[in-house]
UniProtKB/Swiss-Prot annotation:
Cofactor note: Binds 1 Mg(2+) ion per subunit.
Record keywords: Magnesium, Metal-binding, Thiamine biosynthesis, Transferase
SUPFAM superfamilies named among the record's database cross-references: Thiamin phosphate synthase
Natural source organism: Moorella thermoacetica (strain ATCC 39073 / JCM 9320)
Any single Gene Ontology cellular-component annotation: cytoplasm
Family to which the UniProt record says this protein belongs: Belongs to the thiamine-phosphate synthase family.
GO biological process, any: thiamine biosynthetic process
Binding site for Mg(2+): 69, 88
Designated gene of the protein: thiE
Name recorded for this polypeptide: Thiamine-phosphate synthase
Pathway annotation: Cofactor biosynthesis; thiamine diphosphate biosynthesis; thiamine phosphate from 4-amino-2-methyl-5-diphosphomethylpyrimidine and 4-methyl-5-(2-phosphoethyl)-thiazole: step 1/1
Amino acid sequence: MPQWDLYVVITTKLGGGRPTLELVRGALAGGATAIQLREKELPARELVELGRAIRELTRDAGATFIVNDRLDIALAVEADGLHIGQEDLPAPVARKLLGPEKILGVSAGTTDEARQAEVDGADYLGVGSIFATGSKGDAGSPIGLEGLRAIRAAVKIPIVGIGGINPDNAAGVIAAGADGVSVISAVIGAADVAAAARRLREVVTRARGK
């Protein structure tokens, strides 16, 4: 059963010039429970090589490994699953090609999108953007905690809050119904990636009453 407490998205260009695997190791050392590889510009061959290395690191750490958007890469590197946005491969097609055993995550910013994703076979939702964020240019207007609460009431599958989340507001995201938080710059943009991940994981763990 995947644990969504701290879901760290790896996008190399936001990592301050550090090697991708260094960012992954730091996030895992700090307690990341899931890692998503989100590289929109790398050639397929490089993505496969990188994905295989991350697969090994996440397996050793007992963390879930998700690939963003690229179904072919997710299958090639034997990732645990795929995450897609509203403009990516349609969820029913992704589910059919992935098969029943792999995890399918879908981004949702409205209750209608969330309900449809659940019907289409999503295993979890990435919900947001909760707060304003500079990490994703396609994040859209923030839905706030009220938007998150509405989506939580609309679906039964796990929800990971996305967008502008940091140690100061993460507890509120959990209180509003999220099962975990997804972050990019709050962890991989930090000077000490492991320490940043550890702090966020502690906040989420306390908020969830674990």
